[in-house]
């Protein structure tokens, strides 16, 4: 192309990716902010937990808060790879909502530490050294450190595993609190975040399927290897700090859900499934981990989860 030639569409929005545009619009329709939820309402529920149970949820939220960096580093690297504005605009929405997730996790952490920020700092510095968290981070670092040998399709398999597998047991464990009518606001934010991450993983599947033409896909053997490793790590993470008395959560049901979820993502990218686990029982508490069950936050938001608006005009 000569210096005088250019594509006019570079200078205005042109829809090119209907699948990504739909996910972008879905993300916009379901925007929310952490200040719309009143986390202080959950503070009384800390007294309902045993010491083991409280430590378990502190550990879960320690990982979730730290994991935002794993996602955002990858997003920063991926967003520049595509000229299509639909993909760029989708990623702008994802990056925005990831910052909301980060602030939400910080607020929820403080609830479990009874607003003692110093105690949280001490705990986090020790918890991130725990083998169950380090194994996740080291596994991701090993994949990322393959450098130029890691193809673009493999990077998207990595994103599918980060967002679609490495959060699943945490989301499920949090959702079990609802069965005991405690931490209602935390459960509400967990519903919203798990829904967001389902959208994000679906977007990675769409890009992998439709927008990586010219890039050879990894073999089924390679994909299965990565999925099996991720599922094993995720299931081990769940039991690392699980309460000795399983009063709140069903570990077997959550691990089965992790494997079922892996099969679902494999099917979405056209790869044979690995596991025999059935769909979760209808009573399984993680109600919003599928797009089919997506609802707009503002359709069911109530004052119980909203901050107080002061009219000072």
UniProtKB/Swiss-Prot annotation:
GO cellular component assignments: host cell membrane; membrane
Cofactor or coenzyme needed: Fe cation
Catalytic reactions on record: a 2'-deoxyribonucleoside 5'-diphosphate + [thioredoxin]-disulfide + H2O = a ribonucleoside 5'-diphosphate + [thioredoxin]-dithiol
Keyword Iron set for record: yes
Plastid listed as a keyword: no
MF GO annotations: metal ion binding; ribonucleoside-diphosphate reductase activity, thioredoxin disulfide as acceptor
Compartments, as annotated in UniProt: Host membrane
Active site annotation, chain numbering: 105
Binding positions (Fe cation 1): 68, 98, 101
Binding residue positions for Fe cation 2: 98, 163, 197, 200
Record's signal peptide: none
Transmembrane segments: 157-177
InterPro entries for this protein: Ferritin-like_SF (IPR009078), HSV_RIR2 (IPR034715), RNR-like (IPR012348), RNR_small (IPR033909), RNR_small_AS (IPR030475), RNR_small_fam (IPR000358)
Quaternary structure and partners: Heterotetramer composed of a homodimer of the large subunit (R1) and a homodimer of the small subunit (R2). Larger multisubunit protein complex are also active, composed of (R1)n(R2)n.
UniProt record similarity statement: Belongs to the ribonucleoside diphosphate reductase small chain family.
Name of the featured protein: Ribonucleoside-diphosphate reductase small subunit
Organism the protein comes from: Psittacid herpesvirus 1 (isolate Amazon parrot/-/97-0001/1997) (PsHV-1)
């Amino acid at each position: 192309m000569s210096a005088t030639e250019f594509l006019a569409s570079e200078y205005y929005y042109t829809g090119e990716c209907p699948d990504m545009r739909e996910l972008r619009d879905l993300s916009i329709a379901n925007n929310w902010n952490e200040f719309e939820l009143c986390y202080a309402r959950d503070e009384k529920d800390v007294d309902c937990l045993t010491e083991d149970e409280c430590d378990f949820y502190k550990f879960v939220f320690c990982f979730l808060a730290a994991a935002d960096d794993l996602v955002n580093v990858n997003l920063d690297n991926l967003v520049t790879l595509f000229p299509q504005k639909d993909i760029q605009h989708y990623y702008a929405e994802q990056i925005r909502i990831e910052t909301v997730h980060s602030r939400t996790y910080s607020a929820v952490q403080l609830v479990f530490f009874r607003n003692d920020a110093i105690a949280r700092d001490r705990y986090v510095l020790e918890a991130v050294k725990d083998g169950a968290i380090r194994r996740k981070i080291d596994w991701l670092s090993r994949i990322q450190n393959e450098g130029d040998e890691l193809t673009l399709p493999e990077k998207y398999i990595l994103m599918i595993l980060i967002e679609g597998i490495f959060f699943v047991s945490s989301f499920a464990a949090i959702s079990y609190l609802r069965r005991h009518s405690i931490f209602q606001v935390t459960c509400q934010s967990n519903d919203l975040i798990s829904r967001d991450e389902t959208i994000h993983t679906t977007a990675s599947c769409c890009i992998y399927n439709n927008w990586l033409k010219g890039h050879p896909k990894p073999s089924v053997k390679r994909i299965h290897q990565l999925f099996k490793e991720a599922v094993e790590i995720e299931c081990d993470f769940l039991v690392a700090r699980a309460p000795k008395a399983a009063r709140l959560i069903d570990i077997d049901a959550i691990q089965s859900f992790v494997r079922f979820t892996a099969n679902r993502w494999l099917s979405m990218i056209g790869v044979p499934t690995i596991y025999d686990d059935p769909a979760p029982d209808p009573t399984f508490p993680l109600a919003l981990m599928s797009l089919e069950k997506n609802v707009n936050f503002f359709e069911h938001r109530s004052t119980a989860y909203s901050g107080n608006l002061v009219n000072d005009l």
